[in-house]
C-alpha cells in the first residue's frame, strides 16, 4: 500500500484539479494506494467537495488539517496519520504521469536497499522563460539527469538525492526525520513557511536513509510534470531563492552536527566583489552569477549567526 500525501497551502484551484485528475488516472489498482490531502492553513480551506475527482474515481482519500503554517509541520501531520511502508510526497503543482505510482511501487518492492528515490521532474512543454534561467532550473526542482539510474549511500548531497516533489520514502526514513525535528528549536525550522524561502528540508529527510544504511536514488522511469508559476523564473525571485538556499545549507549542516566555517573579517562590499570575481568564472550569465552570489550572502548571514550566538 502506498500513501500519497499532498501538502498544500492556498493552491491554484484550476491546477489542483489537474493534479487530482492525474492521481485518478493512475494505472496502479485503486486498492494499492490511498491519497491524503493535508491543508496547511489555506486562507480558503480545502473541503471534501474540492476532492470530488478522487471520489468519482473510487480512490480512498482523506482530508487532514495542518493549522500551523509550514511545509515541515504539514509533512509531520502526514507522517503521523499514515501507516503504509512507503509514502510519496506530491506537491500541489506536481502532475504525475499515469504509471508513476505503479512504477514507484515496483521499484520499492524490488530494491530492498532503497530508502528514498525520485525521478525526472519536467516542465510543461509550453513553458517559456529567459535563456539564462535554464542554468537555474535545478534550484526550482526541475531535474532530468538522463536515463541512467543513479544511487548512493553517502552522507552528502549528490544527483542521486531526490527533491521532495514526487519523492518516494520508506517509513523508517521518515521516522528518523520525525525524531530529529522533535528536538529542533524554532531557529532551525527548514522548508517553506509562508513567504520564507528556506529549503533543505528535503535533504534533512533523505539523509535519514544514510543513517539506516539505505540508498537514495534517481530513478528515470519515474516522471512528473512540475507546473511552476511564471514568477519563479524572474530574477528577483531567484535571488531570494538562492539566498534562502545559502542560509539553509548552514542550518542543515548545524542540524546534522557538521562543522560550518564562519566567514570573518571582511566588509560586505569586499565579500560581494570577491564572490562576483570567483563566481563569474563558472557561470553562463551575469544573472546566474549574481544568483550564486546571493547563495554566498545567505551563507554569510547564517554563518555569522553562529559567531553571535
Placement of each model-derived feature along the sequence:
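N-proximal low-complexity "stem/linker" segments adjacent to membrane-targeting elements
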Residues: 1-25
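Acidic donor-binding segment of Leloir-type glycosyltransferases
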Residues: 20-65
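Glycine-rich, basic loop-to-helix element that forms the pyrophosphate-binding segment
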Residues: 66-82
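Short aromatic/hydrophobic "clamp" motif used to bind/position activated sugar donors
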Residues: 87
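Conserved donor NDP-sugar-binding/catalytic core segment of glycosyltransferases
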Residues: 99-133
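Short, flexible, basic/aromatic active-site loop/helix in glycosyltransferases
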Residues: 137-159
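Acidic donor-binding loop at a coil-to-helix junction in glycosyltransferase catalytic cores
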Residues: 184-205
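Non-catalytic, C-terminal membrane-associated alpha-helical segments of glycosyltransferases
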Residues: 240-244, 257-309
Amino acid at each position: 500500500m502506498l500513501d500519497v500525501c499532498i501538502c498544500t497551502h492556498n493552491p491554484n484551484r484550476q491546477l489542483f484539479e489537474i493534479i487530482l485528475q492525474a492521481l485518478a488516472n493512475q494505472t496502479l489498482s485503486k486498492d494499492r494506494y490511498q491519497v491524503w490531502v493535508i491543508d496547511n492553513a489555506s486562507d480558503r480551506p480545502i473541503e471534501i467537495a474540492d476532492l470530488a475527482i478522487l471520489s468519482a474515481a473510487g480512490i480512498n482519500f482523506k482530508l487532514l488539517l495542518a493549522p500551523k503554517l509550514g511545509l515541515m509541520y504539514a509533512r509531520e501531520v502526514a507522517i503521523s496519520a499514515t501507516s503504509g511502508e512507503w509514502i510519496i510526497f506530491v506537491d500541489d503543482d506536481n502532475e504525475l504521469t499515469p504509471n508513476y505510482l505503479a512504477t514507484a511501487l515496483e521499484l520499492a518492492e524490488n530494491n530492498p536497499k532503497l530508502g528514498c528515490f525520485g525521478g525526472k521532474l519536467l516542465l510543461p512543454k509550453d513553458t517559456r522563460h529567459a535563456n539564462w534561467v535554464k542554468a537555474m532550473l535545478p534550484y526550482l526542482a526541475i531535474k532530468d539527469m538522463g536515463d541512467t539510474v543513479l544511487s548512493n549511500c553517502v552522507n552528502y548531497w549528490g544527483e542521486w538525492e531526490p527533491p521532495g516533489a514526487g519523492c518516494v520514502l520508506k517509513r523508517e526514513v521518515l521516522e528518523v526525520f520525525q525524531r530529529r525535528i522533535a528536538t529542533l528549536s524554532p531557529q532551525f525550522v527548514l522548508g517553506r513557511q509562508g513567504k520564507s524561502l528556506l529549503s533543505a528540508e528535503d535533504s534533512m529527510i533523505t539523509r535519514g536513509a544514510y543513517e539506516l544504511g539505505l540508498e537514495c536514488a534517481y530513478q528515470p522511469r519515474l516522471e512528473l510534470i512540475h507546473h511552476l508559476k511564471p514568477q519563479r523564473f524572474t530574477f528577483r525571485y531567484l535571488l531570494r531563492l538562492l539566498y534562502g538556499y545559502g542560509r539553509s545549507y548552514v542550518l542543515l549542516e548545524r542540524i546534522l552536527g557538521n562543522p560550518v566555517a564562519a566567514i570573518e573579517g571582511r566588509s560586505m562590499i569586499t565579500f560581494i566583489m570577491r564572490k562576483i570575481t570567483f563566481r563569474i568564472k563558472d557561470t553562463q550569465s551575469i544573472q546566474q552569477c549574481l544568483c550564486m552570489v546571493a547563495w554566498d550572502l545567505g551563507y554569510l548571514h547564517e554563518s555569522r549567526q553562529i559567531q553571535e550566538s
